[in-house]
UniProtKB/Swiss-Prot annotation:
Region (Histone H4K5ac H4K8ac and histone H4K5bu H4K8bu binding), start-end ranges: 156-158
Protein name, as recorded: Bromodomain-containing protein 9
SMART domains reported for this sequence: BROMO (SM00297)
Domain notes for this protein: The Bromo domain mediates interaction with histones that have acetylated lysine residues at specific positions. Also recognizes and binds histones that are butyrylated.
GO molecular function: lysine-acetylated histone binding
Function: Plays a role in chromatin remodeling and regulation of transcription. Acts as a chromatin reader that recognizes and binds acylated histones: binds histones that are acetylated and/or butyrylated.
Site (Histone H4K5ac H4K8ac and histone H4K5bu H4K8bu binding): 111, 164
């Protein structure tokens, strides 16, 4: 401490003595001494710079001999594609518009709470830079899509009055204008009112160190439209009519590029377009995904382009049936064949079966309903009511409506049958439809004898006959029809049950319908 203090005092004394001496010197002498001091300082500075240059050269030689060359930095520079160089150039220009680094790195929950609950696909400049280095971008459109996603995320999470929202909106407008087709091709017309800023060219040291300078051809294209790349920040954010139109145009061009890339990716050889009608009535077809280098591809739409030429002697086009959509006849529940093969509803008619299907949906629903009703058949009324309520809840009330309609239909049929008198002699006209009518003559004799005799029905014999009739009816409904439709299918058991000795019906009103054990001519013909 004492040494430094003494040195300072000596310097002050020396300066005072020099100033006192300069008081008595002329102006020429003072100028000469100043020049000598200046030359002395320059000489000392040159000597120090020379020593540092020699030291740096020696150190580089030592590092070059002792340390191997790191090829990992020079390797990507040699293999980087022109597209990568262009995207790196765009990324650097966009990062300059973000001086505070809001979009430089990924957003975390500590910085923005609940960010990942709102934003499902985050994006930032570092992620885009990594994708460029890994050559994941196949076109400028994909790069623009990620850039738009980053700005949209910021405008979605933040409010319009925040700094982040305003910067994202400004950055989106600037970036799309910079990456527009007109800016890439150098066809955008710049106005004289907007000042063109100076282009700061990177030095040679920066090129060697960072390896981020674009190629000469690409930079030549970029220099043709400097205003679109280096846009002043004030004009970029002002949403006047002209800038708003440019912003919308850039968004439309970006959407069109995305659509064209998707079409070329999924449908490489397709030609998609739209129809446009002119004022004179002509119709044109414009291709959307044509070659961008060529002019707009349009075609005139008329009858000759839609069909072949008309023959001279014909005034109408020939009709050709399309066999690809031919309608075939379906086997529905209302057909006689399905009724004969149906073993579940042998005692129901087609309209009743249609009601069942309308109420329960399909065979599974009908079987489920029948199973539940069979389960509580021997139970009390409370269990049956519960099952009916359950089926109403499942079918939405269709169960009760279906049962009510079927009961109405069966009741009306019974009233009609009780009031009608069956004439057996009218069945003789069906002798030519493969029915065995030999028993009808005997039935006529039995009927005449019963009119004269006042006998009573043996109830025991009738109760024995009913199960036999029911078995025969089930066998006929569930058996497969015979292939020989012209022959009678009546068996010995049928003849035995239908013989006059077994039928002692008398004058009773509860006579069974003969159709229960006689084969119908309609079903026989359909089989």
């Amino acid at each position: 401490m004492n040494v430094s203090v003494t040195k300072r005092r000596k310097k002050k004394k020396k300066k005072k003595s020099e100033k006192e001496k300069d008081k008595y010197l002329d102006e020429d002498e003072r100028r000469r001494r100043k020049e000598e001091k200046k030359r002395k300082r320059e000489k000392e500075q040159c000597d120090s710079e020379g020593e540092t240059e020699v030291f740096e050269s020696i150190r580089k030689d030592i590092e070059a001999t002792d340390r191997p060359v790191r090829t990992c930095r020079t390797h990507p520079e040699n293999e980087s594609t022109p597209l990568q160089q262009l995207l790196e150039y765009f990324l650097r220009q966009l990062q300059r518009k973000d001086p505070n680094g809001f979009f430089a790195f990924p957003v975390t929950d500590q910085i923005a709470p609940g960010y990942f609950m709102i934003i499902k696909n985050p994006m930032d400049f570092s992620t885009m830079k990594e994708k460029i280095s890994q050559d994941e971008y196949k076109s400028v459109t994909e790069f623009k899509a990620d850039f738009k996603l980053m700005c949209d995320n910021a405008m979605t999470y933040n409010r319009p009055e925040t700094v982040y929202y305003k910067l994202a909106k400004k950055l989106l407008h600037t970036g799309f204008k910079m990456m527009s087709k007109a800016a890439l091709l150098g066809n955008e017309v710049t106005t004289t009112e907007e000042p063109i800023p100076e282009i700061i060219m990177p030095t040679a040291a920066e090129v060697v160190k960072k390896s981020k300078k674009p190629s000469k051809d690409m930079f030549r294209v970029m220099e043709e439209d400097q205003s679109s790349i280096f846009e002043p920040e004030g004009n970029a954010c002002s949403l006047t009519d002209s800038t708003a139109e440019e912003h919308v145009l850039a968004l439309v061009e970006h959407a069109a590029d995305e659509a064209r890339d998707k079409l070329n990716q999924y449908f490489p050889n397709c030609r998609i377009g739209y129809l446009k009608k002119n004022t004179d009535g002509t119709l044109f077809y414009t291709v959307v995904n044509g070659d961008p280098d060529n002019e707009e591809d349009t075609h005139l739409v008329d009858l000759s382009s839609l069909s072949s030429k008309l023959l001279p002697s014909f005034t109408t086009l020939g009709f050709k049936e399309d066999r690809r959509h031919k309608v075939t006849f379906l086997n529905s529940t209302g057909t006689a064949l399905s009724l004969q093969n149906n073993t579940l509803f042998t005692n129901l008619k087609p309209d009743q079966i249609e009601l069942m299907y309308a109420g329960y949906g399909d065979d599974t629903g009908i079987q489920c309903a029948l199973s539940l009703q069979e389960f509580v058949k021997d139970s009390g009324s409370f269990a049956k009511r519960m099952v009916n309520d359950l089926l109403d809840q499942i079918t939405g009330g269709d169960h009760s409506r279906t049962i009510y309609q079927i009961k109405q239909m069966t009741g009306s049929e019974r009233e009609g049958c009780s009031n009608s008198v069956l004439d057996f002699m009218t069945l003789k006209s069906y002798s030519d439809v493969s029915l065995d009518m030999s028993m009808l003559s005997s039935l006529d004799k039995v009927k005449k004898e019963l009119e004269h005799e006042d006998s009573h029905l043996n109830l025991d014999d009738a109760s024995k006959l009913l199960p036999d009739f029911h078995d025969v009816h089930n066998d006929r409904g569930g058996s497969r029809p015979s292939s020989s439709s012209s022959m009678s299918n009546n068996s010995e058991r049928d003849h035995h049950l239908g013989s006059p000795s077994r039928i002692s019906v008398g004058e009773q009103q509860d006579i069974h319908d003969p159709y229960e054990f006689l084969q119908s001519p309609e079903t026989d013909n359909q089989n």
